[in-house]
Amino acid sequence: KEKQLILEACCQHDFGKANLIFQAVINPELAEKLNLKPRKVKQIPHGFLSGLTISKDEFLRKSELFTVKDFLPYMTAIYYHHDREDRYTPAEIQEWAERYYLPQLKEYTGEEHKELYATYIGRLLFRNDPTAMRKVITPEMRNEYLLIKGMLNKFDYAVSAGYAEAELEPDLIKKELKASVERYLQEKELRPAQQYMKEHKDENLIVVAPTGSGKTEAALLWLDGEKGFYTLPLKVSSNAIYKRIKGRYEYKNVALLHSDSLSMYLQEASEESVDQRQNRAKMLAWPVTVCTIDQLFKFVYGAIGTEIFAATLKYSKLVIDEIQSYSPEIIAAIIYGISIIQKMGGRFAIITATFPPVLAHFMERYGLLEGKEYQRVDFSADTSIIRHKIEIRDSEMDPEELLEQGSKKKVLVICNTVKSAHKLYQVLESKTEKSW
């Protein structure tokens, strides 16, 4: 049913462009022939007109799968498929459409249209008018609207940009990224977090594991070749993960998306058009996208034009890394956003070194119940990972020993006084250029 709703919306959403004023604007010869001055005539947005052309009964006859509850999400998606302020009354739209739209509609569609249905405008899920009364709509109707509107925009943007496909080919069959990660890890035993996420690839997860436990690779194994978004709080972190996927794992179908991602594409100087790569990233078309969280969660504020993010996340996997780094305001948006994504059918994995218990409390308030909507597992007690070795010396430091240790790993030396630290540094500096 969802596919059918999206297809029907794609077919109907631009009917309104058949109106005489729009045609006269794009075709000056027509305007001259009809002695029209279209720039002096008030225009009604074509999306508003497209929504007038079908009644509830006609809508239900389009598919036996459609129900009365589908009609208003469908109509609202068509009506506002562009972000246009709506201060017209149904009567004003009806009068304008009867004069400039209805006569042209038959020529455009090849079908007889005797009536326009402006009365449905007052029943839309919402009006893009700050003075209009806000309605209470069910989560089911809201999510259906998000899906129809989001996918309609996604297809519309792709076609307008000259692309035949709205999505680049996913990695579902070859699973090249997963295979590359597995090759990289083949000489090592999978760490607990990696093994767990690989085995629970079809579930929503919260995985707590210490720094250095291979959470990034665990998340890539969890993606399992499906369309995925890997989110981080900082641009520099996003750049690092993007480089790791593209470099270490030699996976080319990965995109980077944040406020400064264009500079990264320019640095790469690839044969592919930089603009094209950036535009496809903005359209959420790549199989794997590394991005900052703000690039995806705009839809939680309900702004028209952001539905594409929720609709795309419905059939994607979302990785949220370093959730502890966000401010309370962003945490609130993330929790609300994943509650919507989960209800729509998308999947999420939160990977973190620290997961404050209060987050689980607020997730539960939004219907995200541990053990039902997601599984939580904590590997922070894993003592197999030794990141630092500390030794206290009562005697003078031996520069030769430090140089030997420094040839194998990083060594941090803390002295009692500035004078002794400076003296030791001078000795080391005279023997190696790698001292700081």
Please place each PLM-identified region on the residue numbering.
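Inter-Walker segment of RecA-like/P-loop motor cores
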Residues: 252-302
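Interdomain hinge/linker at the junction between the two RecA-like core domains of SF2 helicases
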Residues: 357-407
